[in-house]
Amino acid sequence: MFNKYVKTFQYGNQTVTLETGEIARQAAAAVKVSMGDTVVFVAVTTNKEVKEGQDFFPLAVDYLERTYAAGKIPGGFFKREGKQSEKEILTSRLIDRPIRPLFPEGFYHDIQIVAMVVSVDPEIDSDIPAMLGASAALVLSGVPFAGPIGAARVGYINGVYVLNPTKAELAKSQLDLVVAGTSKAVLMVESEAKILPEDVMLGAVVYGHDQMQVAINAINEFADEVNPEVWDWKAPETNEELVAKVRGIAGETIKEAFKIRQKQARSAKLDEAWNAVKEALITEETDTLAANEIKGIFKRLEADVVRSQILDGQPRIDGRDTRTVRPLNIQTGVLPRTHGSALFTRGETQALAVATLGTSRDEQIIDALSGEYTDRFMLHYNFPPYSTGEVGRMGAPKRREIGHGRLAKRALLAVLPKPEDFSYTMRVVSEITESNGSSSMASVCGGCLSLLSAGVPLKAHVAGIAMGLILEGNKFAVLTDILGDEDHLGDMDFKVAGTTEGVTALQMDIKIQGITKEIMQIALAQAKEARLHILDQMKAAVAGPQELSAHAPRLFTMKISQDKIRDVIGKGGETIRSITAETGTEINIAEDGTITIAATTQEAGDAAKKRIEEITAEVEVGKVYEGTVVKILDNNVGAIVSVMPGKDGLVHISQIAHERVRNVGDYLQVGQVVNVKALEVDDRGRVRLSIKALLDAPVREENAAE
């Protein structure tokens, strides 16, 4: 019934198994990948026909996590999986980025990749198996794909690179880097690091690429065994006559446009060139396919002009050389009621970054397959359409916004203070108000500045820069601080963030089939030069953490005995509610007895702290207290006196006065304030008090007679 194929290979400390022919046989290809107890099922489906008028490559990648994979039932009312989580979106992008450049130009058939996690080992992340499964399934589908690709996670522990580290090993690692590529070159890198030098980062990329050859070879052997039917697809032939016509109409105007330094004026000139082409070559009778072909020729002509100018040593689009960073403008404290804010402008790219401080109650709760955890630092990136002068829909963040926010967050994680040194929850929002290249790196710079503006004691300043590449044959140029057009028309988007001491985040996407180690070395060196330049200007604007905003909560931390927690909370939460209501504070009590008080003023925090100290204080033997009589006991036993909130003691009838007391009510009344001395606290916490011990003993009559 099943024509099943299995391939097993050793990958670091893990055994990887590829299987096909048993599940989802109606898909173009389907592969089940096992790495330890983590199992990911990947299916590829294709459209043999191109949709009418299609002028782009419609690749869709969806990575999905099923809660049953971890033996869980989803929360919520409907008890089923809903919209994709941030982890699912980021992993979908991780799969997409290295495979997209391996499809030939002009291939416009629909391709859908669905990677589904069906079993999960908490120690083995499912992203690497998902990437390997997508690679294998694409090769088995027979589509024109210049793969397979391999993928590897690289850690760096005690000066040694570790292949595919477990979750426990990553906790000790200074690096979490994912690299993907073909047998010949690297295509994609995604990483975060704890301030590592450039040579260590490059070494990790090279190490990962070397190690992934095992996976690439295994997938090739797997494909040879399955022997899939290969698509008979040929790239459409170039219409040289049409190319010549478009060049004749628009060539000179395009060259003139790319001499204009200002983006909007340049765009207007390019629109003029395109309108001339449309007027001359596109009529009502022209079908969509032909119109798209003309548009594609025009876009390639734009790319040719920009690329040839740069490779010939001419100035870039905005007049810079290959190493210069655009002019910077930095302002902090730009919003009066926020906790911290910064406006970071680099050329025509601008980010308004705003930092907000909160308490531990504001931490983000993440219900991951591997278990629930909280996150005390959030960074959210918003890219509204007005940032590029366009009209567009506003709504939930798109995949790109999620990815850019995550990259900026990775860049700042290494410099955040430890929770014990700074117990606030931190949220940064980066609003991109202008965009012409590298808005994610503007978010890194702006995010760092806004945190400093909010008074967060960062370990160091962090800046980010985006590098580009133009590569033709043996000629290449690495570009510092790329513009939007250089990103679209170039061959690489290489983003590096870090401090003066080293790299904290690195992301690389290659649009061609790989680059060499030499190019990566040059890009890292140029990026460091630019990063140091930006850091100098950031430090000149904000040397270190500013004073805490008057509008930010003040956090006061204290520690109480665990057996006192219930006293502070009170019956049904009555005590803690009264403290928060009376002092206007927020109080959080951890299981270990650590109490965090959030207050808007020092006075309110001190008042709440004092109340808690009173509740948790122990009565000291020999100490004098001012107390209130709360009860007269029956049978003339004595009275109960409250000496502290929640702390009562017994004044026995014999301890009320030196003379013999016949009726307690003759001496004490409920509500009466008296001074008492603590005589004893027994093993059960019961307190004996005395009023008599503070009274002078009466003078005897015989002494008086003398």
From Swiss-Prot:
Which residues participate in Mg(2+) binding? D487, D493
Does Cell membrane count among this protein's keywords?
no
An example of a Gene Ontology BP annotation on this entry? Answer: RNA processing
Q: What is its EC number?
A: 2.7.7.8
Source species, domain of life = Bacteria
Listed under catalytic activity are: RNA(n+1) + phosphate = RNA(n) + a ribonucleoside 5'-diphosphate
Q: Which UniProt keywords apply?
A: Cytoplasm, Magnesium, Metal-binding, Nucleotidyltransferase, RNA-binding, Transferase
Pfam families, A to Z: KH_1, PNPase, RNase_PH, RNase_PH_C, S1
Task: Identify the residues that the record assigns to the S1 motif domain, covering every copy.
Answer: 622-692
UniProt cross-references to PROSITE patterns, sorted A to Z: KH_TYPE_1, S1
Q: InterPro entries, from UniProt?
A: ExoRNase_PH_dom1, ExoRNase_PH_dom2, ExoRNase_PH_dom2_sf, KH_dom, KH_dom_type_1, KH_dom_type_1_sf, NA-bd_OB-fold, PNPase
> What is this enzyme's class at the first EC digit?
transferase
**In this protein, which residues make up the domain named KH?**
553-612
Query: Where in or outside the cell?
Result: Cytoplasm
- Quick check: keyword Magnesium in the entry? yes
Q: Which GO terms describe its molecular function?
A: 3'-5'-RNA exonuclease activity; magnesium ion binding; polyribonucleotide nucleotidyltransferase activity; RNA binding
Q: Which cofactor does it need?
A: Mg(2+)
Q: Which GO terms describe its cellular component?
A: cytosol
What SMART domains does the database record attribute to this sequence? KH, S1
Matching PANTHER family: POLYRIBONUCLEOTIDE NUCLEOTIDYLTRANSFERASE, POLYRIBONUCLEOTIDE NUCLEOTIDYLTRANSFERASE 1, MITOCHONDRIAL
Q: Give a short account of what the protein does.
A: Involved in mRNA degradation. Catalyzes the phosphorolysis of single-stranded polyribonucleotides processively in the 3'- to 5'-direction.
Into which family does the record put it? Belongs to the polyribonucleotide nucleotidyltransferase family.
Could you identify this protein by its name?
Polyribonucleotide nucleotidyltransferase
Question: What gene is it encoded by?
Answer: pnp
